[in-house]
Amino acid sequence: MATSKSRFGLVLNGITGNGKTTLVKAMQNFYNICKFKNPLNEEEAVFYTHASITFLTSKELYHLYAQDNKRFDRCMNTFILAIDDLGTEESDFCQYGNRYKPLEELLSYRYERMLPTIVTTNLSGKAIREKYGDRLADRFNEMMQVVTMPDINFRTPQTE
């Protein structure tokens, strides 16, 4: 069980093309083929295999909020959620005169429930604070272990 001092999220940040998304997809594939004991009942001898990592881009989540609220709610409550390219989505949108911030709402919800969340982003900590505000940035600092990927773009040819 997570304590107030343990981190239950992971942020992979760095330049474009350095393998953040590839690493999360590899984690997703590994996790999806492994069998794990039920974390809610450690005495249970039976392994369950219905665990998975739900993987969506921040833009997909943003659009789900407006177009398929039931699916957005499932993403909010999924055990492990991976959000790719945080920061590429619009910050908010207006519907019937009301302003909504889907990613802030989702991340705050997952923070409050201590749900494991994996994020890839090109944004620095300072840029996350500027885009999402102090409240969410502070929650990120508390819930997320940050891994800064090397400044190598694997999509472009490397010179020796």
Give the location of each predicted region.
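Hydrophobic anchor at the beta1->P-loop junction of P-loop NTPases
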Residues: 10-12
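Hydrophobic positions on the alpha1 helix immediately C-terminal to the Walker A/P-loop
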Residues: 23, 27
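Post-Walker A helix-loop "phosphate-sensing" segment adjacent to the P-loop in P-loop NTPases
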Residues: 29-53
